[in-house]
Regions:
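Hydrophobic/aromatic residues within the transmembrane alpha-helices of Major Facilitator Superfamily
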Residues: 11-18, 48-51, 136, 242, ...
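Alpha-helical membrane-protein architecture signal
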Residues: 4, 166, 231-235, 270-277, ...
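Helix-loop-helix junctions within the multi-pass membrane cores of secondary transporters/permeases
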Residues: 1-24, 45, 66-75, 79-127, ...
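Juxtamembrane transmembrane-helix boundary signature
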Residues: 47-67, 97-98
């Protein structure tokens, strides 16, 4: 690698995930927290977590407040259950502290290393399809239909979809021509193309530079910690964050060829610790669970390979504090082509899956299929592990099931039962 490649990769990653700086404050702001304080908390907690990733694991994986987890925070915990946002932040804090302990004692590392090699490859492919679907959805290329057609292709009279498709083919052309930073250039060019289409909008009160607002420091609520409601919220945050992070780390490191022959991640303990520290920092500052981002794959595709990428990413998140409006004008139609294209790049491990052996191929297929269609990395891993144990039992290959995988299978079955009855 080189400093130039790392920087190009970082900028690509940050642009691909810059939406979180607008989406997360907008979402959590609806709970009464306010856009400005949450924006500041989102950027600072992401910077802290990225620095931890750089110095603890030397990996090019970016972290920030997780999509999905922030929706659960806002619409389920606060909106649906009627809890305060301080209550939700307390659950995030305790989850993060527990993750630090689990990381210190190697529990999370043992879980990752226990996942069979075939399943690790399937996770990478499934994540590729998942982020491809995110890109297609964000751009409005695929849209929900009636029950007869669950998902459909948009008409080309939708400007954002048209701009995104143009941007996708521009990105493909740049990549095929071996142009350095093809994904990043694709984002920039698509943003510019979006101006005459009205997709890229520059507000009248646009300011290049602005001072950040103070976040909500240590805004916790301890009075309802020992309740069933708190346990349900805490457990949901815990499970989703744990396996989303595991899946993302496996997917990104495999794409970057940073794994060993067994598919294990180097310095995984440090990577998991960075994720946990980021979550604690985020809760203390006033934002939802911090987790590893699948959009890091876009940066890897553009050249990021080491912790230097994470250091620069952290720096850019701090810089973003003072350029809120500049990041906000990059439309989802411009980042969508990057996510769709990275989905292609993450398909490669599928060729290494042994589909001739149904005890390997079926669990891999279920993992790959579940992630995009259930819109969940964690549920893809859970169903895949259950299917792996099931197939090995009926295939009379019990010796192929590691002890920890047995335990995970039981935990995942219990989790789905818990989800059904809660």
């Amino acid at each position: 690698t080189s400093v130039r490649n790392e920087v190009i990769g970082v900028i690509t990653t940050v642009l691909a995930m810059a939406y979180i700086l607008a989406v997360n404050p907008g979402m959590l702001g609806g709970t009464g927290m306010g856009f400005g304080p949450v924006f500041t908390a989102t950027a600072i907690s992401a910077a802290i977590a990225c620095l931890c990733m750089a110095f603890m694991a030397n990996l090019p994986v970016a972290l920030a407040s997780g999509m999905g987890l922030n929706a659960f925070f806002t619409y389920t915990v606060v909106g649906g259950m009627g809890c305060s946002w301080q209550f939700a932040l307390t659950a995030v804090l305790i989850e993060g502290i527990l993750f630090i302990l689990l990381s210190l004692f190697g529990v999370r590392e043992a879980i990752i290393n226990s996942i069979p090699a075939t399943m690790k490859k399937a996770v990478a492919v499934g994540i590729g399809l998942f982020i491809c679907l995110i890109g297609l959805t964000n751009a409005g290329i695929t849209v929900g239909k009636d029950l007869g057609t669950v998902i459909g292709f948009v008409n080309f009279d939708v400007s954002s979809a048209l701009v995104a498709i143009i941007g996708l083919f521009i990105t493909i052309a740049l990549y095929v021509l071996n142009v350095p930073g093809a994904v990043l250039l694709g984002i920039i060019i698509t943003t510019l193309i979006g101006i005459p289409f009205g997709v890229t909008t520059i507000p009248q009160d646009f300011k290049v530079f602005s001072l950040p607002e103070a976040p909500h420091f240590f805004a916790f609520e301890w009075s309802n910690v020992f309740t069933l409601k708190f346990f349900i919220v805490f457990f949901t945050f815990l499970f989703t964050d744990l396996f989303d992070t595991i899946g993302t780390l496996m997917g990104v490191t495999q794409q970057a060829n940073l794994v060993d022959k067994e598919g294990n991640i180097p310095n995984v303990k440090g990577a998991l610790m960075a994720d946990a520290v980021g979550t604690v920092a985020g809760a203390c500052l006033g934002t939802s669970t911090v987790t590893s981002y699948v959009e890091s794959s876009a940066g890897v595709a553009a050249g990021a390979r080491t912790g230097l990428a994470s250091v620069v990413t952290a720096g850019l998140f701090i810089v973003a504090l003072f350029f809120t409006d500049l990041f906000a004008i990059i439309p989802s139609a411009a980042t969508a082509p990057a996510l769709i294209f990275v989905g292609y790049l993450m398909m490669k491990p599928v060729m290494q899956i042994d589909f001739e052996d149904p005890t390997e191929g079926i669990p891999a297929f279920i993992t790959i299929m579940t992630m995009p269609f259930a819109y969940s990395i964690s549920k893809g891993i859970a169903l895949g592990v259950i299917a792996f144990v099931f197939c090995k039992i009926f295939g009379r290959k019990l010796k192929d099931i590691p002890v920890v995988t047995w335990v995970l299978g039981v935990i995942f079955v219990a989790y789905f039962i818990f989800e059904a009855v809660k």
